Amino acid sequence: MTFETGGPRGNDIGLLDGLMTNRAMRRYTDEPVADEDIWTCLQAAVQAPSGGNIQPYQFMVVRDPGLRIGLAELYRRGWARYEPAIAPSEFPNDAVREGWERNNRATVHLAENLEHVPVIVLLLMPSIDMTVHDDEGPMPVGPTHASVYPAIQNFMLAARSLGLGTAMTTLHRIYEDDVRELVGIPERYEVLALLPLGHPTGKWGVAPRYRGADKITSWDQFGEKRTP
């Protein structure tokens, strides 16, 4: 099965086409995003499954230019600390080095231009402990985040179908308290993710992955591999 690579397309793309060709977009034009398209992405997001249908999230859509500048400044402060901390001292081969450098250039571009993206969406999650207990003790069924990430994925796929690009970022969390203060988010909410939303300058396509599904999948017993 093959999937298309190319520029923006309408909402006639198939589900698998969207899944296989959606990728993090970090370069955007300054073309506005229509309210209708924002609502479509939000409505798709809330249709995502969540544990017990609890929908443990809130969305904040930021379009005000001053607020976008403020978020961008906090994002850049975080990136200035984060980039040198993750820079590898060596690479196993040239392909890995080239891939890292290409991704880093795109990440730097987003950090330097975030305020120019027409829409920034923040994903909020209440800071609550969902652990339940019985007579035998706590039952650690996993963090609440597991019921938020599917909504983020739905949002991103809906954007893809509309010819819009986005990327899930978390660098803002380095200065999360400042982000809350800037846009008036109560302290009880964790600002889980930041998603730029706009018209991308790049192309969609099947992104290169260094490990295919056959390399990271076991069948019945850990380490038992199959070929597709």
Predicted regions: what is each one?
Residues 27-28, 58, 165-169:
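Short catalytic-loop micro-motif centered on adjacent basic/acidic residues
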Residues 80-92, 183-208:
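A glycine-rich helix N-cap at a beta->alpha junction
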